[in-house]
A protein has these predicted regions:
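An alpha-helical support segment within catalytic cores of ATP-dependent transferases
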Residues: 1-45, 56, 110, 172-178
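ATP/Mg2+ or Mg2+-diphosphate-binding catalytic cores
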Residues: 2-5, 9, 127-180
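Short amphipathic alpha-helical segments and their helix-coil junctions
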Residues: 17, 25-28, 62, 94-113
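Short, solvent-exposed segments of well-ordered alpha helices
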Residues: 38, 113-117, 150, 154
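Short beta-strand segments
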Residues: 42-45, 62-64, 127
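Catalytic activation segment of kinase domains across protein kinase-like and atypical kinase folds
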Residues: 50-80
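Short, charged/polar micro-motifs that form catalytic or ligand-binding hotspots
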Residues: 67, 86, 116
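Active-site activation/catalytic loop segments of kinase-like enzymes and analogous catalytic loops
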Residues: 73-108, 119-139
Length: 180
């Protein structure tokens, strides 16, 4: 399926559905205003095992803080689940979500925001993996790859497949399901 057709026939209709459903489920208390700082957390936004080193004692050191700042803990929770490098099984997803629910239990609307936001983050990641189709970002990847065998067409096919998989996963999401 060509990218333009995918965006028009798959992504856009799904985006409209997800946006409407998520908006209707979003807690009224935070729908039209910024989340107060006391409900935010420091977040690297690219938090995951792909950005850490495991020491000989088993401890983990996180290295990549490019997008570090204050944010809704829902973003940290969702990005950890949706990031393509994570690839968590259902059991680990449940453990992560349960731990995050416990950690942010002082926020009475955290779980509602998480449930409403999870499909939105899936849609976001569907677009992020398509960055390979943007010439300037593809060139950055080519330069960072360092090998002379960088195959743009092959990379685009891989990323396109990931985007379609993200959309399928979002389609199968029950918006009223508690993710924790």
């Amino acid at each position: 399926m060509e990218l333009a057709i995918f965006l028009e026939e798959v992504f856009d209709p799904l985006w409209k559905k997800v946006k409407n459903e998520s908006t209707s489920l979003w807690p009224e208390e935070s729908r039209m205003q910024n989340l107060p700082r006391n409900k935010q957390t420091l977040s690297s936004s690219d938090f995951g095992f792909h950005n850490c080193v495991k020491a000989s004692d088993g401890s983990l050191t996180f290295l990549d803080f490019d997008y570090f700042g204050w944010d809704d803990p829902v973003k940290l929770t969702a990005d950890f689940i949706w990031h393509p490098a994570m690839n968590l099984n259902v059991e680990l997803e449940k453990k992560w979500n349960a731990a995050m629910l416990k950690l942010f239990s002082g926020d009475p609307y955290f779980e509602e925001r998480l449930n409403a936001a999870m499909p939105l983050y899936g849609m976001r990641w569907a677009l992020i993996v398509l960055n390979e189709f943007l010439p300037e970002l593809a060139q950055k990847r080519r330069d960072a790859d360092g090998s002379k065998e960088y195959d743009l067409e092959k990379r685009q096919k891989i990323q396109f497949k990931k985007a379609t998989q993200y959309c399928e996963r979002v389609k199968n999401t029950d918006f009223r399901f508690t993710f924790a």
